[in-house]
């Protein structure tokens, strides 16, 4: 069981904190000789497989690493342009790792804003007054859990569908936010959370929840 991600969204719909705790990925790594027998193309500043599905590599997968070095968008971590590098026969043999494209910071901001809007729509559509809004969304691979405070801050956790005790974990995260963000004299309300103690205690809470499978009182 696992907790995949934690998001904190302010009352205006802005993403003020995000942590990827654990994200299972269907990744495939293979060593290639020249010429590369896959067709790669640039799309949305990512290098994607356009043709040549094989050995766990799928159309739409992105180039994640070359020779063990991470790829960020269209460039490797040391600044090499991916398509240019792979087009040079002198660089072969080459090991390439493929997988689902990772979300960019801008995409995470956009998704947080979209969820904020959906939450508001859900509250308005409720036949009963005082609706709590969206508390959980379920898919076949994860569950999204949301807890909104009285001040409008939303704490969102993406977790394995089998993970128990998320309601208690959400309230624990709120407690950590109150203790290590709100009480930090250098933190401004509604602004991105950059507090080391908040990071440390949040990661510890996630570890406890994952190991126990639940997060009960006294944790």
UniProtKB/Swiss-Prot annotation:
Keyword ATP-binding among UniProt keywords = no
Q: PANTHER family from the entry?
A: TRAFFICKING PROTEIN PARTICLE COMPLEX SUBUNIT, TRAFFICKING PROTEIN PARTICLE COMPLEX SUBUNIT 4
Give the protein name, as stated in the record: Trafficking protein particle complex subunit 4
Q: Please classify the protein's predominant subcellular localization into one broad category.
A: membrane
Pathological condition linked to this protein in its record: Neurodevelopmental disorder with epilepsy, spasticity, and brain atrophy: An autosomal recessive disorder characterized by severely impaired global development apparent soon after birth, early-onset seizures, lack of psychomotor development, spastic quadriparesis, progressive cortical and cerebellar atrophy, and dysmorphic features, including microcephaly. Death in childhood may occur.
InterPro entries from the UniProt entry: Longin-like_dom_sf, TRAPPC
Q: Where in the cell is it found?
A: Postsynaptic cell membrane; Golgi apparatus membrane; Endoplasmic reticulum; Vesicle
A single GO BP: vesicle tethering
* A GO cellular component annotation in the UniProt record: endoplasmic reticulum
């Amino acid at each position: 069981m696992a907790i995949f991600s934690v998001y904190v969204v302010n009352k205006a719909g802005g993403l003020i904190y995000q942590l990827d705790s654990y994200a299972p990925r269907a990744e495939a790594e293979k060593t290639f000789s020249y010429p590369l027998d896959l067709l790669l193309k640039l799309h949305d500043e990512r290098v994607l497989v356009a043709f040549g599905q094989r050995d766990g590599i799928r159309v739409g997968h992105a180039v994640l690493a070359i020779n063990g070095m991470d790829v960020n968008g269209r460039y490797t971590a040391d600044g090499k342009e991916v398509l240019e590098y792979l087009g040079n026969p002198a660089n072969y043999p080459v090991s390439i790792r493929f997988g689902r494209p990772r979300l960019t910071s801008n995409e995470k901001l956009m998704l947080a804003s979209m969820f904020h809007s959906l939450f508001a729509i859900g509250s308005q559509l409720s036949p009963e007054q005082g609706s709590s809004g969206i508390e959980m969304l379920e898919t076949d691979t994860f569950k999204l859990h949301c807890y909104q405070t009285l001040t409008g801050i939303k704490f969102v956790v993406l977790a394995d569908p089998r993970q128990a005790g998320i309601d208690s974990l959400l309230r624990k995260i709120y407690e950590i936010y109150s203790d290590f963000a709100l009480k930090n004299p250098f933190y401004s309300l509604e602004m991105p959370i950059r507090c080391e103690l908040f990071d440390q205690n949040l990661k510890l809470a996630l570890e406890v929840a994952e190991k126990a499978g639940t997060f009960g009182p006294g944790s």
